[in-house]
Amino acid sequence: MRIPLILMFALLAACSAVPPAQDPPEVGEDVQVPQVRIGREQVENVFVVVNTVEPVAEAYCLERAPDLNCDFQIVVDETAGAPPNAFQTQDDTGRPVIAFTLALLAEARNQDELAFIMSHEAAHHILGHIARQNQNARAGAQLLGGLAYIISGGSEDSIRAGVQLGAEIGARTYSKDFELEADALGTRIAARAGYDPLRGAEFFFRIPDPGNQFLGSHPANAARLATVQRVAMQL
């Protein structure tokens, strides 16, 4: 597994010793100097965690989902003003991509937190959550689109609105379950990689608690912590 150069450039730029009041060094027209700055120790933590967790996540992936592409790529999302966040997606070839925002890297206090977050995102891929979410979205779109057709008598605007609403509801229907599933498997991945998932899950206490919102995308922090504790006790 190779860490993309974009990660190296982003992290090195982020921990630059240049004071904010000074003009940043020239880094080329296609590279933006991030507004969020992280320390040298945090940069080192990221590299250690990525190099430690990725092989374990890949092994889990090959064991549980051998038909998937298990070659994880780790990148940094340099979107200006992006809040602390991490997410899993796929590139055009189906390769799994785990992205961290610089704000999250600055917020994480130790390697255990970084390891748990990365393991959680890897678990989303291993468990096939993107495909399952898309399937739910299609089902919701077909259902509400069909109802809109019947109720409106075939109005294109009504059908389009029904399809869009149905897709959104369908995608969110099981999203909380997906997050808890990823927490459970992420706990196992982080622990196998040598990290403390309970310590890593302390990150939950420093982010807003979504509570139990109807059609919310994430479960309450208490439910997530309980899942981590339950799985950790089984290890």
Labelled PLM ranges:
Residues 153-199:
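Metalloprotease/metallohydrolase-associated module, dominated by Zn2+-dependent proteases
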Residues 173-175, 192-235:
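Long, well-structured alpha-helical subdomains associated
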Residues 43, 47-54, 101-102, 111, ...:
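Extracytoplasmic/secreted envelope proteins and their assembly/folding machinery
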